Amino acid sequence: MALLFLLLVLGFSSIGSQAFVTSHYWGTFSPFFPVPSEIDPAIPSGCQITFVQGMMRHGSRNPNAAKLKQYKALIERLQKSVSNYGKRVKFLQTYDLAFDADQLTPFGERETFDSGRSFYKRYQALADHNEPFIRTMGEKRVVESVSLWKRGYYHDMDDKPPTMVPTNVIPKTEGFNNTLHHGTCTAFETDYAFRGKEAQKPWLAKFTRPITTRLNEMLPGADLTTTDTVHLMQLCPMNTAINNIRSEFCDLFTAEEWMDNEYSETLAKYYSWSYGNPLGPTQGVGFTNELIARLTRQPVVDHTSTNTTLTGDPATFPLDKKIYVDFTRGNTMLAVYSALGLYKNVRPLSKTRRTPAVDAGGFQTSWLIPFAARMYVEKMKCGGQDEEMVRVLVNNRVIPLSGCGADKLGMCTLERFVESMGFARSGGHWDQCFL
């Protein structure tokens, strides 16, 4: 399996009495891994799944074109200005970037295939008798991820259909309403979306300062900046994923520094896409209202980012399915988590002191939106209960629902869950998008 392979590639170190896995602190560049759960993620004894909504992020990818340009400029500058390389950084003298911008890596392809296979195995009782309805936003690597996921989904099915179910692609076009891709909330796109970067700055300056000093001592003449340091850290996961061996970039940084770097990204995400931003959760309201419609088998009621042409047509938005799977990118997933009220009890994250994931209710970027991230919204019928129950898992971690009287398994009745979605049902501040 992809996860086991990467762990073997990366190896382990220790911090305190616990094993430290570097790849669990790569933020959005982390490969998928099952996140620790205080509640057993297995389907509860005596319960039968009657509905599942999956939301998936694409697998591991190469750097995007803009980031690749920045990496190339940094490496070219280093190789021109540095003549004396220490042993630990000697590899930089001949290092060559071998990336294919924006494309999935071979590891990411396997990761996504495994995601589909895992989904089928978990929901086999439902999947063997019900076709999934699958949608995606229209970005190349995301669309490719759907095909890989479907291959994994059907891989272990004894009675395979003659053809895989089609994929409904929602165009990533400016001005085109799309619940799987942000872009239509003007105030967010032009202002609020950048607040995470501002919130990140104090911590970024604090944790990178000693690292930058150390690297400049190792690379005399490099004159590295904070941004350069972060880019060198990012080249660790990027090179590891494409080469299938642990990158030498990874060994330039300590376990504490990896945790600090992860927290920096967590701050940026929290203050852009989640509760730290007045319009962050708003970007997930449209999908949340679609989810309510699917759970209740009632028409969509929404005046935000839904596309009424699509949601009004049973061919593009059926209400009679038991398995729905949507593919998107990490930021949209995070906005959806927040619109759903997940992690709602997280206190505002400190901009100057690192808050560990366990103290932040699990709010850590690599726990939320790693490559091949997945959210499952399950509806189930449990013995002795008249009404169906709803619960949510994010990367194998049960996220206890809030505001609906959740039981010890983190579940709420369907009726109370829908009632608790007041933020989304009332428009989620969408009116502020155009002030």
Q: Over which residues does each language-model region extend?
A:
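Fungal secretory targeting signals
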Residues: 1-19
